[in-house]
Amino acid sequence: IYNDPMCSYSLSDNQIGRIYRDRENGIWIGTNLGGVNYCPQRGIEFTRHIPLSRPYTISSKRVRELVEDEEGNIWVGTEDAGINIYDPHTGVFKKIGRDVGPKSVCEKSLALLADKNYIWAGSFKNGLDMIERRNFSVRHYSGEQLGLNEASIYALCEDRKGKIWIGNAWGVYVGDKKTMTFTRLPQFGLSYIFDIIEDSDGYIWVATMGNGVYKYNPEDRKIKHYMHREGDDVSLSSNSVSNIKETSSGEIWFSTDRGGVCRYNKTEDNFTTFSEKQGLPDDTAYK
């Protein structure tokens, strides 16, 4: 699947930054210079959404994040033009601050998280916006108000107990929705955090740039650190991991920089790597 200049139903851009599956099993693909592409469950052709001069189109070609809310709307975080909401019933995009709601400070979106009432939007050097889903009001928190050492937020995760996990260039923070204050967890060091998820067993997985992957048990606070070991084919394939995903069958997969993608083997506590040698088009994978 790639961009074909001669086919208007192909991908709009070969630089893929984000892949997201919605509740209808449709696939959304965010790109670096081609906006967002959509393919329905049984489709073979992509619909392209790019900025146009007419109203209610996406605000940017540079798509960083995609998330679906409880009503089936797709929220699109861009790297240079704020946050858009796509309504699948009307087929239009609305930008926060342009078409609905007050202006959001989150013009450079790095992370999105959907809960029952809000969309949490982490920004580049500008803290966090909480956007009320129904009236689009925006509540802003600076990095200082949240207790962060710096104001960028690269990863957001809500665990089964309602705790919010934040990742940035200073490591991992965890906090409470009611107080909106966060505490840095020193167990993860001063790692640059790319992604955080909670798996179906309740473990917190943390992906870093240059420092591998952490697996953390919130119950007993035990932590395990996985890194690439030269010559070890069943170790993590790269220490720079951009994304973590769990499949419906409970498999944990990792996208890496120059290491292809890895699957965690739970029983053996090791990894299987899939790279250009196994047919991937590139050894650098994103979201």
Map each language-model feature to its residues:
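Carboxylate-rich, polar loop motifs that coordinate divalent cations or form catalytic acidic clusters
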Residues: 1-287
